[in-house]
Swiss-Prot record:
Name of a matching Pfam family: Acylphosphatase
Keyword Hydrolase: yes
Annotated Acylphosphatase-like domain residues: 5-92
Protein name: Acylphosphatase
Keyword Hydrolase carried by entry: yes
Organism of origin: Chlorobaculum tepidum (strain ATCC 49652 / DSM 12025 / NBRC 103806 / TLS) (Chlorobium tepidum)
Length: 92
């Protein structure tokens, strides 16, 4: 299993529509670790880590988003794996 960690910024109608909970469910279903949070500029930030294929699946789901959202852009950058990260959570 090849692990990777990505940093993601999601733009569009992504706050106030259940986006962070959607990311939490999708990441947890794939046994990924990391976190998600709203940013003051209206975007959502995500860091996700785990099996490379499962991280890619999460990225595909984030591009779609929950039904009430409208994703206009997504920026993905691969970053260094954090071996201390064991769960996925929503940051406030």
């Amino acid at each position: 299993m090849t692990e990777k960690r990505v940093h993601i910024i999601v733009s569009g109608l992504v706050q106030g529509v259940g986006f962070r909970m959607f990311v939490l469910r999708e990441a947890s279903a794939r046994s990924l670790s990391g976190w998600t949070r709203n940013l003051p500029d209206g975007t959502v930030e995500v860091e996700a880590q785990g099996d490379s294929g499962r991280v890619d699946e999460l990225i595909r789901q984030i591009r779609i988003g929950p039904s009430r959202s409208s994703v206009t852009s997504i920026k993905v950058k691969e970053i260094e794996v954090d071996t201390s990260c064991r769960e996925f959570r929503i940051l406030t």
